[in-house]
């Protein structure tokens, strides 16, 4: 039992580490905890600043690659046992999601299409019913054991359509004026020789306002999580061994 648990936890952690291909995430003020939760198993969230800020952030020294993502939390839907996290990304600049989905899907993600996580119930006709609309699903990903299993991925051009659809059937997920320019995070891969913390300081020096932005270091989250899980598994193995001996 302990061995199987270890394998399952390690599989989940490996999936998470592959997903966290960025060294640094820049997020809006007061949203660091929400962003960290999205990287593990937290609740779906909606938060954003605007594309002009994202464009400025990308000008900092020490950045090898940068890409934007937009997060939308849906209401409970027929397709899902839990709230759905909608993740908008830019396939042209992305280096985080594409490598992770490459084994399941090849080709461009067209406007209006979705890639679904493992726990999302896709209809027999290959669609998901969300906000009163049927969205075509081009691929469904393997189980990761993380919150990504309750997520769907869309391209950034589809985000305004999603916002408009939400307004027709429920509370609008964000103001219409922001639908085409909302960015939840800038995912950054640093240049060789640059620490993520150094790049964060470079970003802050670009504009005094950027000192108030949130800075998340995904590598630290996975390292801490793996350490905690290793300790948990050790305790569980001891517990299972004691129970087994007592049973004998």
Go through each PLM region and give its residues.
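Structural beta->alpha junctions
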Residues: 40, 142-144, 188-196, 219-222
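Envelope-exposed proteins and targeting segments
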Residues: 20-22, 62, 82, 112, ...
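Peri-transmembrane interface segments
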Residues: 9, 13-16, 33, 196-246
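A short beta-strand structural signal in non-transmembrane regions
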Residues: 24, 172-204, 213-214
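Extracytoplasmic/secreted envelope proteins and their assembly/folding machinery
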Residues: 51-54, 156, 160, 200
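Hydrophobic, regular-secondary-structure patches
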Residues: 3-85, 205, 211-213
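A short acidic, helix-capping loop that chelates divalent metal ions and anchors anionic groups
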Residues: 34-38, 145-147, 224-226
